[in-house]
Design a protein with these regions (language model features):
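HAD-like aspartate-dependent phosphatase fold
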Residues: 2-111
Length: 111
């Protein structure tokens, strides 16, 4: 997610508006460390409407948030990651982190 995890929650309905959320710098640093180490493929998901793609990409670039893919327009509901494992990779490799909105402690949660 972007709002409430990488930037303080923003909205297209009320301030702070999309594109102007305050960066959660420690969370951004933790995510960028994963990206830079090549230990993860970073796919950001958001309920921001597709019409805000340019604004969102500009915001992510301006705030130094590195990622591989951006999925927009998701509903405000549970997001489920499904992944398999097999004899060649016998340990489940999918993980999810749920964190309180606007909390700046992603690094601790990644341990």
């Amino acid at each position: 997610d972007i709002d409430g995890t990488l930037v303080k929650n923003s909205s297209h309905h009320f301030p702070p508006y999309i594109g102007s959320g305050e960066p959660l710098k420690d969370n951004i640093a933790a995510l960028n460390e994963l990206y830079d180490n090549g230990k993860a493929r970073i796919i950001l998901t958001t309920s921001r409407p597709e019409r805000y793609r340019q604004t969102t990409c500009w915001e992510l670039e301006r705030k130094g948030i590195r990622f591989d893919q951006l999925v927009m327009g998701l509903p405000h509901s549970q997001r489920i990651l499904i992944n398999d494992f097999a004899k060649s990779n016998p340990y489940p490799s999918a993980a999810a982190i749920n964190m309180p909105r606007n909390k700046n402690d992603l690094k601790e949660l990644l341990r």
